[in-house]
């Protein structure tokens, strides 16, 4: 991708740059290999299967919030075992703050998983004064410039940042919310499409029904919320003019929604896919207020209903997210959110958060990559499933 010397002055310029970089990245990486058709082995562990085992179809795991700037977390990544062929990992943001650390982590993960998918969290977009990770590559001195530099890093590491089909074999496939109670089902294809959903939080998230009962619509930001992500730096084209370190501008979330729509309209990244293909989406931020299980004191910096609407609009049956460091695995009725174009898709979606988080937050095996597709028929829907 060609670097730029000066920050473009308009929102459309930034939109073209970021969406174009994602589409270009998708074209530069080879297509994933098709599953071999080897027989399944139900005795394999879901957290650390033997690397010599090759499943009949692709398996997809999810994790978020690695925060590998912390030495303890980096050692955790280094200690991860290798997973079998045809195993993919979704990394739902907050790998690290420094690009060099993010690169190291992504390379380590690519050694352990055949395919790795990534979407930026807020920590990746923190930007110190120049020279920094954005400017040394010739990109604008702001968080979107840093995102462009991170897309370059992902391409160099073989990590995917755009919608990608993991091709399976004809036969039994499963993993969507519809399978959670009925088990695997017969399909014409065992393909699965993995779709990164870029996003940012907005104030409206805290005012929706699920969170609003705990959050006053009229209250001011808490101290934690007010300075949240002051490490980011936003161009005036999408942020608040004269306040580049203010991450609360509504234009940030709407910009990323437009990036998604632009990428998904491109022929090389087009979604939704054909009928009968499962769709896995993932974001860093919380996609719906109803699946946010954290404190109301942080609700204004947690997520956006727009993320969930976009994910469900392309037919997602499983959505992986992060950010709040509160793990979840629930199947939720989303019939009130589904876009008309997706009305024939499932009206239920599985939402999974599996955060490594900070060392002080971990207990037991928390943070081990969690299998999110295909879903094992023996797994429960989760204690908080809504219907």
Regions found by a protein language model. Give the residues of each.
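Active-site-proximal loop/helix segment associated with metal-binding centers of metalloenzymes
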Residues: 178, 195-281, 285-297
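Charged helix-capping and loop-helix junction motifs
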Residues: 105, 143-146, 297-306
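Short, flexible/disordered intra-domain loops and linkers
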Residues: 128-144, 294-298
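N-terminal active-site segment of His-dependent metallophosphoesterases
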Residues: 2-119, 124-135
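Active-site environment of divalent metal-dependent phosphoester hydrolases
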Residues: 67-72, 96-100, 123-134, 162, ...
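Binuclear metal-dependent phosphoesterase catalytic core
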Residues: 54, 293, 298-299, 305-317, ...
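Hydrophobic alpha-helical segments and helix pairs
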Residues: 140-171, 188-230
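Beta-strand-turn-beta hairpins that frame and shape the catalytic cleft
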Residues: 53-61, 165-195, 276-278, 331-336, ...
